[in-house]
Amino acid sequence: SAVVKRCAERITAYQIWNEASLSMFWNGSPEKLAAMTKSASDIIKAKDPKAIVVAASTTVRLPGAFDRFFPKYLAALGALGWPVDAFAAHLYPASKDTTDERAAFVDLVKADLAAANAPDLPVWDTELNYGLAGPGPTNPRQTIEGAQARDWVVQTAFDSLHLGIARTYWYIWTPLPYPLLGMQLTNDSGAVKGLRVVDQWVVGATWQGCVDDGSVVSCSVDKKGIPSVIAWAKNETGTFAPPADLTQACNTANKCSAVTGPVELTETPTRFTE
């Protein structure tokens, strides 16, 4: 109550708990956390009705912990009338895994939401990185840097847009490298270059939706009257025929080449523009 009173209209969203699927952060029951979520929501909404109440986040990469916590937490929230405005997950994959596994985790979260008959609320990925050590000793920390980091950041952004993740928060932008992370987000890092590419391609644009043909996902964008299509293969490679008026294919380094017909794509998004 004191926090909301002091910070009303300065804090726009309150996530109720961090990684509650892990006993190191929460050792009560899912039902008890749901009750606390309801109490916190009532306090927040009474003092700042415009604030967004975000459910406690769950991790996914430890499937046992996820399965023990998330369905029961959702059921308890439902019994309390769904006192949240958004759901949250931390979609870190195992250290050796890739953007593919992160996308699969989105499907797991959404499947549990559907099974719980949850309302159609935004889903946020409130903490994400790649290459973090774990789970277990067979998954040591990996280093993802340079062009690979740039590509994964761009791919993650478009996976989120395509799969319905309303917000994606990267952990963590730092002035100097942070040893915990597999992917550094310093100002000159490949990952931050990827964020700048996403900004150039879609921030301030009108998102016009995606088409998934089973092999390729293609998403249409209009930015200040300039149309483009961002497309990528779902499984390593796929062939895509861009609209005839889009004659340039640009990679995540913003290096462009002329196209006159179908293009062989990889899982890294390519931008087609005039």
Task: Put a short name on every predicted segment.
Residues S1-S21, F25, S29-A35, K50, ...:
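Substrate-binding cleft of extracellular glycoside hydrolase catalytic domains
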Residues P30-V154, L163:
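Noncatalytic carbohydrate-binding groove/subsite architecture in carbohydrate-active enzymes
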Residues N129-Q200, C210-S215:
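Aromatic/acidic polysaccharide-binding cleft in carbohydrate-active enzymes
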Residues I16-L22, A55-A56, A89, D125-L128, ...:
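Conserved beta-strand positions
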Residues E9-T12, D85, A166-R167:
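Short acidic/polar active-site loop segments enriched in Thr and Asp
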Residues C256-E274:
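C-terminal beta-strand-rich structural cap/linker in extracellular carbohydrate-active enzymes
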Residues V211-L246, T252:
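Carbohydrate-binding surface patches
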